[in-house]
A protein has these predicted regions:
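Active-site beta->alpha loop and helix N-cap motifs at the rims of alpha/beta catalytic domains
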Residues: 2-12, 16-143, 153, 161
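Catalytic alpha/beta core domains of metabolic enzymes, predominantly
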Residues: 128-131, 140-190
Length: 190
């Protein structure tokens, strides 16, 4: 895991602006510049705040590629690539890697409520791409929670897993993860 980045600091979950039913790339570009000018330490397009479940595949791909291009290496870009479909999450993760993203934010597969083993297998498959993974544990949105044991297992067994965005709002869960492994813990519930 020494070759993988450690994502730290305040990062912004970007909104995906629309105008007349289309992604407003001018507004997105202005937002990216403003966030970088104000000192953000990372950009996260196509996460929950970026309305990833409501974007078409084409829109999703274009927003990620645009964000990477606009950031131009000034700050890391962690592209939201999660899906309740492992194959779709793989496609999104591969695209993010090809576009030049520095990492990917992988929300727990929503609606289907897989077992902890199923969650682990989902993450392990995505890890095969090789793009650094930030797990996203937000059970209030997904209906399923990664347990601390599963987080530790993913971190220890899947070299691409470098961080978790822990959004359960449960200090005991965060403490259990922190005391069990050296994964970077990011916090946020948006």
């Amino acid at each position: 895991m020494t070759d993988m980045p450690r994502f730290v600091g305040s990062m912004v979950a970007l909104v995906t602006p629309f105008r007349d039913g289309e992604v407003d790339f001018d507004a997105l570009g202005r937002n990216i510049e403003e966030q970088i000018d104000q000192g953000t330490m990372g950009l996260v397009p196509c996460g929950t705040t970026g309305e990833s479940p409501t974007l078409s595949h084409d829109e999703h791909d274009k927003v990620v590629a645009f964000t990477v291009e606009k950031a131009a290496g000034r700050v890391p870009v962690i592209a939201g690539t999660g899906s309740n479909s492992t194959e779709e999450a793989l496609r999104l993760t591969r695209h993010a890697q090809q576009a030049g993203a520095d990492g990917c934010l992988v929300v727990n597969p929503y609606y289907n409520k897989p077992t902890q083993q199923g969650l682990y297998e989902h993450v392990a498959r995505l890890g095969e791409v090789g793009l650094p993974i930030v797990l996203y544990n937000i059970p209030g949105r997904t209906g399923i929670e990664l347990t601390p044991d599963t987080v530790v297992r993913c971190y220890e067994d899947v070299p691409a897993v470098v961080a978790i965005k822990e959004a359960t709002g449960k200090p005991d869960v965060t403490s259990a993860i922190a005391s069990s492994c050296d994964i970077t813990i990011l916090s946020g519930d948006d």
